[in-house]
């Protein structure tokens, strides 16, 4: 036993050396375990951000559809309006970069001021765009269509993990597929419209709703 060995004896020194090696091995094993945990947390965080953004997109779509239903006269031609064509005022056509630079200034607050249907649509879009920006990384959106044919909504957000090789230290951001009009299924739901001019790293999620 180390406790009973003579101080300075060969046996005592040997036992102390074995104990030191055991401690070093234990530290090495612990370090490897901690690195594994850190890697797992990083991967979990990556998928959590993407899942969170998609979940936010669904909530934002519900928010916009409710606003349009409350103010339908500003959403363009209705089913009953045969022979009459009006353009929806719930439209967003600016590309991704332009929206990032927009100040989203509200000039008329329709929560405290009586607004026309047109003013309400403008207010709704500004509030909604603020929520898009706050809910998703560098969030932006495109909105087209009308209440007769349905409103097409494209949500856009920046995802730093959208790269060509996730396992490479020199991975580069890639550009999402641009919609051609012939896509189906998941490809149709995740392509970015050409009008968005989405840069590398931006993901898109497309939806359609009829008020």
Question: How would you name each of these model-derived features?
Answer:
Residues 24, 52, 56, 62-211:
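Flexible, low-complexity segments enriched in proline/glycine/serine and punctuated by aromatic residues
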Residues 1, 46, 117:
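Generic anion/oxyanion-binding catalytic loop in active/binding sites
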Residues 14, 18-62:
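Aliphatic-rich helix starts adjacent to a transmembrane/signal segment
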Residues 1-13:
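Single conserved hydrophobic/aromatic residue that forms the stacking wall/gate
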């Amino acid at each position: 036993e180390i406790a009973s060995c003579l101080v300075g004896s060969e046996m005592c020194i040997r036992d102390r050396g074995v104990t030191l090696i055991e401690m070093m091995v234990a530290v090495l094993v612990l370090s490897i375990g901690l690195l594994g945990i850190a890697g797992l947390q990083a991967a979990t965080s990556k998928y959590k951000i993407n899942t969170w953004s998609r979940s936010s997109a669904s909530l934002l779509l519900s928010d916009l559809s409710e606003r349009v239903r409350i103010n339908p006269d500003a959403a363009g031609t209705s089913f009953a309006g045969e022979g009459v064509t009006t353009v929806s005022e719930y439209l967003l056509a600016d590309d991704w970069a332009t929206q990032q630079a927009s100040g989203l200034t509200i000039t008329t607050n329709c929560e405290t001021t009586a607004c026309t249907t047109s003013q309400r649509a403008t207010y709704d879009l500004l509030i909604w765009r603020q929520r898009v920006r706050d809910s998703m990384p560098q969030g932006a959106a495109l909105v087209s269509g009308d209440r007769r044919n349905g409103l097409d909504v494209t949500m856009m957000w920046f995802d730093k993990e959208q790269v060509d090789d996730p396992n490479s230290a020199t991975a580069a951001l890639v550009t999402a597929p641009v919609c051609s009009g012939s896509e189906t299924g998941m490809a149709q739901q995740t392509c970015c419209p050409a009008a968005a001019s989405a840069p590398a790293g931006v993901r898109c999620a497309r939806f359609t709703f009829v008020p």
